[in-house]
Amino acid sequence: DSRSLTCELGSGPVFVAMCGANHDSHAFVAQMYARGVRAFMVERPLEALPECGYVVVENAIAALQCLAAYHRAQFRGTVVGITGSNGKTVIKEWIAEELPAGMKCYRSPKSYNSQLGVPLSVLMLEGDEELAIFEAGISKPGEMERLERIIRPDVVVFTSIGDAHQENFLNLEQKCDEKMVLAHRAETIVYHSYYEPLGRMIASRFAGRKLCDAASCPEVPETLIGNEASRRNARIVEAFCAAMGYPAPSFTEAPEVAMRLEVKDGINDSVLINDAYNLDLNSLALALDYLHNVALSRRRTLVLSDIAQSGLTDDELYGRVAGMVARAGVDTLVGIGPKLKRYAALFGCDREFYASTDECIARIGRRAVAGRAVLLKGAREYRFEKLAHALARKSHTTVLEVDLDAMIHNLNYFRA
């Protein structure tokens, strides 16, 4: 994104200049060069720039997709593709939460499921993950074939089928056909036969594959998850875990996906960015990028928990975190957890540390919050939603009750 250049970018960023019906990103090449970018993928030759390299391609998005497909081909872990009309992100996050302890998993950030979002998310794979989960979304025929070549999923999870983007398809069967392209090479397919005609079409077309129908999984009690659609999603997650040989999900609660990069007014004239659902290096980089865009002239506070299951040594992990924090221009780091405190010397900004989220809520200073843009970025087990509630500006509802009978009585009294 040419508007921000704050996330961790490895040995050097590449700016991909794309042309669309109403935009031409080549207009930002000079700006990106001035900000230190020295590698470009463009659709037409550039004017000579010192110490600059560029590749000219016919179509930048298509070239990016080819690059992502090559990167995916080097990956040796298991790849999961999730598609459907609704519930892709919810099920992705839910699956990630229910994985066995210690498993290193990558999942695509936010809802990166488009022709551009999928290659970007695939290129974020570090390569040593055991499991990678990607969303694939389409809006018209022909799109899924390109996404399938990039993702090449070993396992495909189908969510619900509904009317989203139906205007571009002749009927629901054609839409199901298009979505099923994602399973072209998949060995395992998870679906819910409640959603027709998808269930019937999958059972017919992929009869020779390993099929896991969520309808055969035990019902999730309404006392645990009240919403019917969420209970169906839960059974899809249960079917996935069974297909993979993982322990059965706990289903203590449905994932609160709205907690991702949610902006709210905070106490003491602050702005809160709540990204308290999960934490890894990729999602931290994206969240810091978002903080840069939201903060504008405000000072920046990052409230961060310890990071688990990164696959890196603590020295390497927190060294990288410190570099990301410095490049993002964070003014104050509020660290929660013993490991961040142990590596306090790596951070050059103002900093304060707490052993737990509850201690942070009780003791965090006004100076770290007042008038600032505050990013809350925590692992699920740290329950940062409690911190978000404590730091959010409270609004109260006032109810005005009017007794019309009494008003008429009073009016008649004074008329008399």
Model regions and ranges:
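Acidic, Mg2+-coordinating active-site environments of NTP-dependent enzymes
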Residues: 42-51, 154-271, 297-298, 323-332, ...
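Phosphate-binding loop of NTP-binding sites
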Residues: 63-188, 197-205, 366-367, 385, ...
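Residue-level signal for inorganic ion chemistry
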Residues: 13, 32, 67, 82, ...
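N-terminal leader/targeting and accessory segments in enzymes
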Residues: 1-66, 294-296, 310, 316, ...
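Generic structural signal for well-ordered alpha-helices
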Residues: 288, 322, 404, 408-415
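Short glycine-rich anion-binding loops that position phosphate/pyrophosphate groups of nucleotides
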Residues: 20-22, 46, 138-141, 162-164, ...
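Glycine-rich phosphate/pyrophosphate-binding beta-alpha loops
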Residues: 256-259, 274-286
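Mobile, glycine- and charge-enriched loop segments
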Residues: 11-17, 120-132, 154-156, 291-311, ...
